[in-house]
Structure formats: C-alpha cells, structure tokens
C-alpha cells in the first residue's frame, strides 16, 4: 500500500487537532478536541499535560476513522504546538510532576521582576532575541522546580525531563525513546542562544535549570523517532517534523525568501518576517527568533505580537452583545463609509509590539451623539489593522526591507472588509491563500520533506494557491491621516493609567 498522506498534529492553546494532507497540500480530513483550561489563581493558566496527550490520541483516531484512511497509508507525522508552554515530567514513569504552565500564564512575574532587578535584561536579549517576560518557558521551569518538593535535586540527578509541548508529544508518541525539540521551539525558552545554537551556560545558571533536563535540539525537518506501534494502530510511523505554531505558519505560507512575511489573525495577531540566515537584532520592540532549521542551516525571523485581535470581536459579541456571531461584523462595518473618527484601542491585557506596555487598558475615543453600533464595530475591526501597521513599521525599520505583499491566515481573514482595510492602511497587497490551515500545513511540509514525500521548497511554493488578493485603493493622505489618529489614541490611552 502506498504512503499517500502526511498527518499534522496541531496542538493549540484550547484544543488539539489532527489534520491529514495529501501530496497537493490539500486537506483530506480534520478532527478537533478541546481540553480543560485550569485557572488556579487570577492571571495563572495551566493545562493537564496528560489530558493534552489523551486529546491528541483521540483526534488521531478520529481523523483516521472519519476519512477511512489506514495508519499504514501515512508517510510521516509533523507536530506544531502552542509555543513556550512548559512541562516537567519523570523520566522513569512519564508522569508530569505539575500541570503544564501555559504561555499566557503570568505566575512567574515575580521571578521576572527579580531577574530584571539583578540586571540580566541586556544579556538575555543579546543571546535569545527575547525579553525577560513570564511569556517564555525558562521562568516557568524555574517556578515548577521551586514549587514541587525535591524537584530541583531530582532534576540535577537526571530524573526529571523538561519540554515544550512538541517535546512532550514526541516523547509520548515514541514511547520515551526521543527527548528532542526543534530549533524554533528551543528559541522560545529563554535558555537557548539563538546565534551560537546551543543551550547557554550563562542562561541556565541565571535560572538554575539543570542541563540534564533539557531535550536535544534538532532540525525542524528530520526523522526524530518512530511511533511505538501500540500508540499508532500497530504501525511505526516516522515522527519527522516539528515547529512552533507561528514558525510553522510562516513555513506553510511558503515565506521562504528573505523579506517575505505573514500575519496570523487569531485571538491575537502574530506577524513574522523571514530575515534569512541573519538574526536581526531589534531596536523597535520586536522579538528575534529562529524560523526553522533545515538542510543544515538555521533561518531567522522577526516577530511582532499583538495581544488582542479576534478576541476584540468576541468582546463585541459576548461582552457588549452587539451581534450574534463574529461573521456579522463585516455586514455592520460596511453599512457605514468610515468609523466617523472613532478609534478603539483594545488594550484589554496591555499592548504588545512595539509598545510592550502591560499597564495600559482598553479605551475608545472620538464618540459623538451620532456614533452608531456600526461605527463602533467598524472601529474595532480597524484596530486589528492599525496594530498590524504598528508591527510592520517596526519590522521595516529593523530589517531595512520594504514589504511588498503580506500573506494572511487565521480566523479573522474571512472578513473581506478587514482584509481590504488592512491593504489600504499598509499600502501593500494582502494575499489570502486557498488553504488557511497554514500552521498544520507547515508542520506537514516539514515532516514530508524529511521522508521525501515532498522533495524541495520549490514544490511547496508551487502548492501555495491564492484564494483572493486585496490591493490598496486608499490615497496616501487619507492613510496618513487615519494612522495619525490611531497613534494619538494610543498615546492618550497610555496617558490614562
């Protein structure tokens, strides 16, 4: 029987998904399962790593059943994951010693404050391209070792293992044979030197994390291990690709050339620009990260994070009850010709790139007696585009590259009004692909390349199909005036603390 499919496991923040792709990069089937979010205290977010594993097994079985595909028809498995989320488990039993600490969780804020006070900020950014922030894995590992009795000593003796979610899943699928991560996930831990490509002694010492816990760092496209047959319907299938979700989306969007960029419009927005084999050190509040390791080379990216995007539309729907479904936002927005001077700054949890202001809160400016629900909804949608322009300006300033085209994916890209406004505001074309599951597709491509299912990046580029292109129609003067209003609104929101 021929190997016809690649299985992508997309392990996200609220659900796990299994997606089958064929050789053309088309979706054959999807299965999804949500799992529990654990909030022990305000600002803390945890997951049960065993429940994540159970959800992954469930969606693998579900997608094979739904599509009538047999396990032996799968050429390889690729994994993409919510990044930074940290798991610590016992090497012998495979039992996690504590819940996984999720990327969103702020429970390590105290550790971060101490590190900043001790003057580590510059060294950390210099080596990792990141900031000292609870977002990244390193302080999460420290927290678990501090809060579980005897964990530090056990870790030093080599009895405990640490991994991001990709590492946990590869370890489980391989029956404990492979304790590995890829370059892209390692680059999000705060423990990895992205320029020398190694776990860094100075960073490990800063957080007192024992080297014995750490996974091997491997290329993003390589056979790491095979599934143990009892976890995979009697088959030993190569586990052959891994990348963090945003890097996988960059790969799935075929952004292989230096200067190509994608923006994912999900709960938040994540914009990544490929900077080639040079890590660009940001002076404008961006993160420098590894995009992937492939063919013996590491490629880098600049990343901008917008905390609130699609969740602002959910707020209109659930919090303000302005509409019944997020889809309706487009209809409301197009009933008016402009937002009539209204600006929504959706800083519900602070502002990300380029401001990194965690104290600012949401604000609305420019309301008059004539402001309608339609204006309000339109202004909220426009805020996603304004925040994206903030990030793009920082990227262009850091990289010296002028973007010509932005490739987009994520739930909110179905909104044609938003995509057109985004193009108008940036003054560049916005391209929406036919296959919008680009994160899973990226993981599938990485795995497929490792086993010869696809042979080159050129083949993948040829698979990329345009569904719709949005071209800028706005006059430069109008664009500048609108954006100036946004900048004024952000400054005013920041002043109100």
From Swiss-Prot:
PTM info: The phosphoenolpyruvate-dependent sugar phosphotransferase system (PTS), including enzyme I, and histidine-containing protein (HPr) are required for the phosphorylation, which leads to the activation of the enzyme.
Binding site for ATP: 13-15, 267, 310, 314, 411
Cellular component, GO, one term: cytosol
Protein name per the record: Glycerol kinase
Reactions performed catalytically: glycerol + ATP = sn-glycerol 3-phosphate + ADP + H(+)
Organism: Halalkalibacterium halodurans (strain ATCC BAA-125 / DSM 18197 / FERM 7344 / JCM 9153 / C-125) (Bacillus halodurans)
PANTHER family found in the cross-reference section: GLYCEROL KINASE, SUGAR KINASE
EC number per UniProt: 2.7.1.30
Function in brief: Key enzyme in the regulation of glycerol uptake and metabolism. Catalyzes the phosphorylation of glycerol to yield sn-glycerol 3-phosphate.
Record-stated family: Belongs to the FGGY kinase family.
Modified residues (Phosphohistidine): 231
InterPro entries on file: ATPase_NBD (IPR043129), Carb_kinase_FGGY (IPR000577), Carb_kinase_FGGY_CS (IPR018483), FGGY_C (IPR018485), FGGY_N (IPR018484), Glycerol_kin (IPR005999)
GO molecular function, one term: ATP binding
